[in-house]
Amino acid sequence: MAVIPMVVEQSSKGERAYDIYSRLLKERIIFLNGGVEDEMAKLIIAQMLFLEAEDPEKDIYLYINSPGGVVTAGLAIYDTMNFIKPDVSTLCMGQACSMGAFLLSAGAKGKRFALPNSRVMIHQPLGGYRGQATDIQIHAQEILKLKEMLTRKMAEHCSQPFEKVAQDTERDNFMSAEEAKAYGLIDDVVTKR
């Protein structure tokens, strides 16, 4: 089990200890670190809704270091990013692959960033299913619908033609931070705050 550092904050009321993530949440920073899955999505969504309730006018900062993960969990985060009033600024630190790259590109226009040594990877959704032939066919049709929808949305976020994004996501497509900027996945590569 990972050790989560604690930070102590001094105020006129005395001292208060926070775990580091709670302290950063006070600064409106949310971490998407690791595989995108339902439990993580639930926490990120709750944090976004909390921060919106605290101040609907101030930006939220989503820091991403993710190999990707479950499409439906990622879409729940994506829909919440679009549902809430505050802009969500995204920052890739480390890697943003698959659903991580999709969420990175979905940040507010002009507020999508990557650190200089970050890696971004886009591809088509992955899936697998076992069972009766008819059920396999149903699941295959569903993943093709998801592929079309994700490609269309990424094309919108990147200001790229649908056909180009469809072609570029046929296989794993790795990019440096500068290449991700040129593609339109992010707006800038940042080295300092």
Swiss-Prot record:
EC number: 3.4.21.92
GO molecular function: ATP-dependent peptidase activity; ATPase binding; serine-type endopeptidase activity
Compartments reported by the entry: Cytoplasm
Pfam family name, one: CLP_protease
Top-level division of the source organism's lineage: Bacteria
Active site residues of this protein: S98, H123
GO biological process per UniProt: protein quality control for misfolded or incompletely synthesized proteins
Principal localisation: cytoplasm
Catalyzed reactions: Hydrolysis of proteins to small peptides in the presence of ATP and magnesium. alpha-casein is the usual test substrate. In the absence of ATP, only oligopeptides shorter than five residues are hydrolyzed (such as succinyl-Leu-Tyr-|-NHMec, and Leu-Tyr-Leu-|-Tyr-Trp, in which cleavage of the -Tyr-|-Leu- and -Tyr-|-Trp bonds also occurs)
Alphabetical UniProt keywords: Cytoplasm, Hydrolase, Protease, Serine protease
GO cellular component, one term: endopeptidase Clp complex
Function of the protein: Cleaves peptides in various proteins in a process that requires ATP hydrolysis. Has a chymotrypsin-like activity. Plays a major role in the degradation of misfolded proteins.
Subunit architecture: Fourteen ClpP subunits assemble into 2 heptameric rings which stack back to back to give a disk-like structure with a central cavity, resembling the structure of eukaryotic proteasomes.
Family, as annotated: Belongs to the peptidase S14 family.
Protein name: ATP-dependent Clp protease proteolytic subunit
Gene source species: Glaesserella parasuis serovar 5 (strain SH0165) (Haemophilus parasuis)
